[in-house]
Amino acid sequence: FEPTEHESADANLALAERVFDECKKHDLLLLLEAVAFPYNGETKKDASFLDRKAETVIESARVLSRYCDIYKAEFPGTLGRESDQQLEDNLEALDASSERPWVLLSAGVDYDDYLDQVDMALHAGASGVLGGRAFWKEYFQQTDADGRRAFLTDVARKRLADVDAQVRENGSPWFTRYGFSAEDLGTVRAVEGWHFRY
């Protein structure tokens, strides 16, 4: 999603609104992910793309997050390119722009960088993570089945456990975005067999 690329942004916005309306109609949760993209011959490593990435991520959340139940956001900046203070400011702006609970995607960055991104995002208001490649991409570098199994069992499992511990300690509860407290949720009772109507 590129808010300044009006033709594609308008089409994507209309699609997001339509899909969210259908999900509400059928009582389905919608997770929406928007990613910044290079255009006009850029690559994701070009300064022109990197210069606008944070603003694209923040503005995308402002525009799109109302059309979902959970918003999946990119990290608004680049570790080592912007200062920690700038990245923290970007994350606070992302949090303020998102109308829904948001989680951080990994975009395939190296695990150590993702761990730093997760820490910063959780302290800025993220409710959790929805990462993939940062946890397991080295799996494909293993030369045999035993190596792949060992990687998943030892390395990937530990990574997931470490990030899970971070989320449990520092994540913002999703329900606070909707104005609820833990006490409010504690009063909710579901009728036995409620799920059969689905």
Feature locations, PLM:
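Alpha/beta enzyme core
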Residues: 3-21, 25-29, 37-100, 116-127
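Aromatic-lined carbohydrate-recognition surfaces of secreted/lumenal glycan-active proteins
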Residues: 31-44, 103-104, 171-182
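C-terminal extensions of enzymes
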Residues: 170-198
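Conserved, mostly hydrophobic/aromatic
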Residues: 33, 71, 132
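Catalytic-face loop-and-helix region of soluble metabolic enzyme cores
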Residues: 75-179
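Charge-rich, low-complexity amphipathic helices
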Residues: 45, 136, 143-144, 185-189
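Low-complexity, intrinsically disordered regions enriched in charged/polar residues
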Residues: 51, 157, 182-185
